[in-house]
């Protein structure tokens, strides 16, 4: 199975830096999950409606990591991580 290359939006990079300082354990969980996604990005749930070009994975019960897949360049672009309600605007 091919391994996709990672891309990370600058907004997410900033959130990950803050998470690294505030909650090292959750940071490590996120990084491990990102590695898993790079190995098989199509395993995760595609979104619908306004977010139909994106996929998501729950990091824990409340937090969601959003990403997109670029098949041509074999890149997974990690876009955002936030509380479920903020991601979906609930």
Give a label for each model feature.
Residues 13, 48, 88:
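Nucleotide phosphate-binding site architecture
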Residues 34-58:
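A short, surface-exposed loop/turn module that caps and links secondary-structure elements
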Residues 1-6, 17-27, 59-64, 68-90:
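Enriched for short, Lys/Arg-rich terminal
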């Amino acid at each position: 199975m091919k391994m996709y290359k990672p891309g990370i939006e600058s907004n997410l990079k900033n959130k990950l830096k803050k998470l690294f300082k505030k909650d090292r354990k959750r940071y490590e969980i996120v990084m491990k999950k990102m590695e898993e996604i790079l190995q098989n990005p199509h395993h995760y749930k595609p979104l619908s409606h306004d977010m139909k070009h994106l996929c998501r994975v729950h990091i824990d019960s409340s937090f969601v990591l959003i990403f997109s897949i670029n098949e041509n360049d074999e890149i997974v672009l990690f876009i955002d991580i936030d509380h479920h309600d903020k991601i979906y605007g609930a």
